[in-house]
Swiss-Prot record:
Cofactor dependency: Mg(2+)
Pathway: Carbohydrate metabolism; tricarboxylic acid cycle; succinate from succinyl-CoA (ligase route): step 1/1
Gene name in the database record: sucC
Binding site for Mg(2+): 199, 213
GO MF entry, a single one: ATP binding
Catalytic activity: succinate + ATP + CoA = succinyl-CoA + ADP + phosphate; GTP + succinate + CoA = succinyl-CoA + GDP + phosphate
Protein name from the UniProt record: Succinate--CoA ligase [ADP-forming] subunit beta
Binding of ATP, residues: 46, 53-55, 99, 102, 107
Protein's organism: Alkaliphilus oremlandii (strain OhILAs)
GO biological process: succinyl-CoA metabolic process; tricarboxylic acid cycle
Quaternary structure and interacting proteins, as annotated: Heterotetramer of two alpha and two beta subunits.
GO cellular component, one term: succinate-CoA ligase complex
Chain sites annotated for binding substrate: 264, 321-323
Record NCBIfam families: PRK00696.1, sucCoAbeta
Length: 386
């Protein structure tokens, strides 16, 4: 689950992390009041959407007067902001964060994330903070520092100091910076984060350490024990199909392609998307119905796939273990009849009750193409939609 920048900063403030004073507004008529409230000669007007790259897309503006604060707020509110993370459709700006400006002496990048190679949390840092951090990571990986954190000990002072030394942070600010890192780590652990990113972390010209921007993602599996975090969820920023899928405990992620996929098991789902790409197609989604899905769950999964107007064909790839092939077949047939299937459908079934499942499909009178292998299915669906 993602949250907005202003929400992330409110959370970090509770953990003792220095952040700029700011006010969030939803109506341009509140812009002047917010500007007066932060009591700053320079204000930063920032579009609030669940995507990075706002600065390069014109979603962050520096205002030198209250008049400019109102002007920039009017320009941004209601605007569709397109960044490299939003896709071509972009995101509509429905909230603005107006916060105090500060004179920046130096920018850094600090983040906590899961290091899957080591199965531990990693502190990632760079002296090259700011809008171009992704280019730095791609072209100058030697500028990226990593500290692996022992979960039994947590982030230690010596690790924090080592990062500070490697970032060339002034000695007078090392204690403050280490304390900030430890507070970020505490938030990461206690709130079940999957990513906590500060970009940039800045040293101001009056020698303060401050988190100027913040991005936090949460592990959805931990939300049950963080109800305060769950309350921050903004459904307007989420894909409608993903919201619908979450109601039925389906793992669904929208993609940019035109071949809908329904698979059981995350590994098989990723392999299915890969093989579709291999044969020249583009998957429209990741969809894992799970190991013990009911007929109703399968039917709802099928409906969600078909609700995507980009979908020109569907590939169902099921290996029945706990999941029975006849249950999948019944769900597909019922959903196809209900929504009046009008796109090509390729089904590959293997495993428990496979013959019964195939019989159900054959007797359905639907235009279903069967496949013997995953590769066979991928080839057929790619050919059918061209």
């Amino acid at each position: 689950m993602n949250i907005h920048e202003y929400q992330a900063k409110e959370l970090l403030r509770d953990y003792g992390v220095p952040v700029p004073r700011g006010q969030v507004i939803y109506d341009v008529r509140d812009a002047q009041r917010a500007a007066w409230h932060i009591e700053s000669d320079i204000a930063v007007v920032k579009a609030q959407i669940h995507a990075g790259g706002r600065g390069k897309a014109g979603g962050v503006k520096i205002a030198k007067s209250i008049t400019e604060v109102e002007q920039f707020s009017r320009e941004l509110l209601g605007k569709t902001l397109v960044t490299h993370q939003t896709g071509q459709e972009g995101r509509v700006v429905k909230a603005i964060l107006i916060e105090e400006g500060c004179e920046i002496y130096k920018e850094y990048y600090i983040a906590f994330t899961l290091d899957r190679e080591n199965s531990k949390i990693a502190l990632i840092a760079s002296e090259e903070g700011g809008m171009d951090i992704e280019e730095v990571a791609a072209n100058r990986p030697d500028k990226i520092l990593k500290e692996i954190i022992d979960p039994l000990i947590g982030l230690t002072d010596f690790q924090g100091r080592r990062v500070c030394f490697n970032l060339n942070i002034d000695g007078s600010l090392i204690n403050d910076t280490v304390e900030l890192m430890k507070n970020l780590y505490r938030c990461f652990i206690e709130k079940d984060c999957s990513l906590l990113e500060i970009n940039p972390l800045v040293i101001t010209k009056n020698n303060r350490v401050m988190a100027l921007d913040a991005k936090i993602n949460f592990d959805g599996n931990g939300l049950y024990r963080n109800e305060d975090v769950l309350k921050l969820r903004d459904l307007n920023e989420e894909d409608e199909k993903e919201i619908e899928a979450s109601k039925y405990n389906l793992s669904y992620i929208s993609l940019d392609g035109n071949i809908g996929c329904m698979v059981n098991g995350a590994g098989l789902a990723m392999a299915t998307m890969d093989i579709i790409k291999l044969y020249g197609g583009n998957p429209a989604n990741f969809l894992d119905v799970g190991g013990g899905a009911s007929e109703e769950k399968v039917m709802n999964a099928f409906k969600i796939i078909l609700s995507d107007p980009k979908v020109k064909g569907i590939f169902v790839n099921i290996f029945g273990g706990i999941m029975k092939c006849d249950v999948i077949a019944k769900g597909i047939v019922n959903a196809a009849n209900e929504v009046k299937l009008n796109v090509p459908l390729v089904v590959r079934l293997e495993g428990t009750n496979v013959e019964l499942g195939k019989e159900i499909l054959n007797q359905s009178n639907l235009n279903i193409v069967t496949a013997t292998t995953m590769a066979d299915g991928a080839k057929k669906i790619v050919k059918l939609i061209k």
